[in-house]
């Protein structure tokens, strides 16, 4: 057994020790058990860090005696692509996932200790302890799955040269994109644990933890979606920056769920609202991360991004085959199923125990369009967008769904979300009736422009339909930002931050509509030495050569 094997087998043992100590501390409050829990998790972080550094050193020297290194590295590769091999396959990415979870878990454990657990309200202290226990349990499952895809397995026989990194992956983006993705995955574990602790015990500690790691997850995932789109557009030649590929779509879902959670957390912090929905949304982020990982790792969906090649059988046959042959995917399915069961049980339990509330009566238009109602509408519209995208992802398991299927079914909900955002943002300055008239005018203009452009070219309706809503929502955002122009710098930046993010999303949505709505695609077939006219240019094919990303 080599040092890497020893470290990977040590991790579950450290987690078991941490769980035992944490459970005893939860029961009797013994400070020695609390110390043992902290020490165990600290050693776990050290073990995972050492594992990653050891694996990186093997890639650095191209240690072909290890099967994982031989699969993703070669002597002639540039150094940065050798090191990128660490996260080129399932084994290394899961190791990063475990490391990021342990990092966040230690941060929360020592942060709570530094703040003084004894000074916290009893309910918050108990909730904090539960949170650490729940996150440790999920990490134990991930560390156990890691044993089935061990990057330190020896090659038999040892090859004379490595396979190297796929030429499509030899891009500078490969050096930063995957590790950021799986670091965000690790932070999602803390989100789930925070939501579960909120449903299992009373207290307010979960909300600060959820908001902290939710923001990190949102920022990291947004950056990887942006980088991945640019990478696909400029390097890989996969048909543009967004193609609604199953892996792309499954990667968008956790970001949508986290976006919805962060919005719900705002009202949870301000008005103690969404006491059930908020934790449920936090838990949903990890559930969708596990689904995304299953889509990527399982080989069930037909995708150019998948780790495993798909076969020609039906989805059910592919699922049964991978469950029979791949222990790691089987473990992932068990973890996903277990988290779903726990989520369902705790949600129903919390719902049945929640005090009954009287439904609010609304008679006037102003009451239907007030702050709480429009915010509630925006939350559930985001959930509808998430649900439609998830259903379409599941429907496309046996074949590729073209982009227009997603676009036509999501467009109405995106327009509704823009209307609710405008009314919510501007109601402090304008009467609701006036804002509603603006939204109706935007809807009419959107329909007219979309219909006119649709007659010119299929798909161009998106550009016309998106423009009025982008102008309306953009104006609402700028009006809000302008209202803080005379405030001190720090309060101004705090108020501006979320709305600048909203403005960026508006521009992305408009850019998507223009880019894919007004693009023109023409297919030309050429043989070597031949030429043809296309889009006003003469295209000549001189030669066909494959080069690595550095050349």
Language-model region placement:
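Contiguous transmembrane helix-bundle modules in multi-pass membrane proteins
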Residues: 1-30, 43-50, 64, 246-254, ...
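Membrane-interface helix-loop-helix modules in multi-pass inner-membrane proteins
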Residues: 49-132, 146-165, 225-269, 296-303, ...
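Phosphate/diphosphate-binding loops
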Residues: 260-290, 520-522, 533
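A conserved hydrophobic secondary-structure block that centers on an alpha-helix together
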Residues: 9-19, 93-94, 100-135, 140-156, ...
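Membrane-interfacial loop-to-helix junctions in multi-pass inner-membrane proteins
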Residues: 27-49, 110-139, 200-219, 244, ...
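Conserved, charged catalytic cores of large soluble enzymes
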Residues: 25-30, 119, 155-159, 186-207, ...
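Extracytosolic and intramembrane catalytic regions of membrane-associated proteins
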Residues: 538-551
């Amino acid at each position: 057994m080599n040092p890497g094997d020893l470290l990977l087998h040590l991790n579950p043992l450290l987690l078991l020790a941490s769980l035992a100590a944490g459970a005893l501390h939860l029961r009797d409050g013994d400070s020695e058990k609390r110390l043992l829990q902290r020490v165990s998790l600290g050693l776990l972080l050290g073990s995972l860090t050492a594992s990653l550094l050891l694996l990186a050193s093997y890639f650095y020297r191209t240690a072909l005696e290890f099967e994982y290194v031989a699969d993703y590295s070669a002597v002639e590769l540039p150094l940065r692509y050798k090191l990128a091999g660490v996260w080129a396959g399932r084994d290394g990415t899961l190791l990063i996932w475990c490391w990021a979870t342990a990092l966040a878990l230690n941060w929360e454990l020592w942060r709570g200790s530094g703040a003084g657990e004894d000074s916290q309200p009893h309910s918050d202290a108990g909730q904090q302890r539960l949170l650490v226990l729940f996150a440790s349990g999920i990490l134990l499952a991930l560390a156990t799955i890691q044993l089935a895809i061990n990057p330190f397995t020896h090659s038999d026989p040892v090859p004379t040269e490595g396979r190297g990194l796929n030429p499509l992956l030899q891009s500078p983006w490969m050096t930063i994109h995957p590790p950021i993705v799986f670091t965000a995955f690790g932070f999602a574990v803390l989100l789930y644990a925070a939501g579960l602790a909120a449903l299992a015990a009373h207290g307010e500690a979960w909300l600060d933890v959820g908001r902290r790691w939710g923001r990190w997850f949102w920022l990291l995932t947004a950056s990887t979606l942006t980088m991945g789109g640019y990478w696909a557009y400029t390097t890989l030649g996969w048909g543009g920056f967004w193609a609604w590929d199953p892996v792309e779509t499954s990667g968008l879902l956790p970001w949508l769920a986290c976006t919805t959670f962060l919005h719900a957390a705002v009202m949870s912090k301000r008005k103690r609202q969404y006491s059930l929905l908020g934790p449920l949304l936090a838990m949903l982020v990890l559930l969708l991360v596990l689904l995304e990982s299953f889509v990527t790792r399982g080989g069930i969906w037909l995708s150019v991004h998948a780790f495993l090649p798909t076969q020609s059988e039906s989805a059910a046959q592919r699922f049964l085959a991978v469950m029979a042959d791949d222990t790691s995917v089987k473990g992932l399915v068990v973890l996903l199923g277990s988290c779903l069961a726990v989520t369902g049980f705790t949600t129903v339990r919390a719902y049945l125990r929640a005090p009954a509330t009287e439904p609010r009566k609304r008679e006037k238009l102003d009451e239907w369009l007030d702050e709480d109602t429009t915010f509630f509408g925006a939350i559930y519209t985001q959930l509808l967008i998430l649900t439609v995208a998830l259903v379409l992802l599941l429907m496309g398991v046996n074949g590729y769904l073209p982009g227009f299927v997603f676009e036509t079914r999501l467009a109405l909900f995106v327009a509704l979300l823009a209307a609710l955002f405008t009314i919510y943002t501007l109601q402090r300055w304008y009467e609701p009736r006036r804002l509603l008239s603006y939204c109706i005018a935007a809807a009419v203009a959107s329909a007219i422009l979309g219909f006119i452009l649709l007659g010119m070219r299929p798909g161009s309706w998106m550009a016309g339909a998106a423009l009025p809503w982008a102008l309306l929502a953009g104006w609402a955002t700028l009006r809000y930002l302008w209202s803080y122009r005379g405030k001190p710098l720090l309060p101004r930046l705090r108020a501006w931050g979320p709305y600048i993010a909203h403005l960026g999303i508006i521009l992305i949505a408009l850019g998507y509509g223009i880019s894919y709505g007004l693009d023109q695609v023409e297919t030309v077939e050429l043989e070597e030495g031949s030429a043809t006219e296309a889009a006003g240019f003469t295209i000549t094919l001189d030669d066909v050569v494959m080069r690595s990303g550095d050349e």
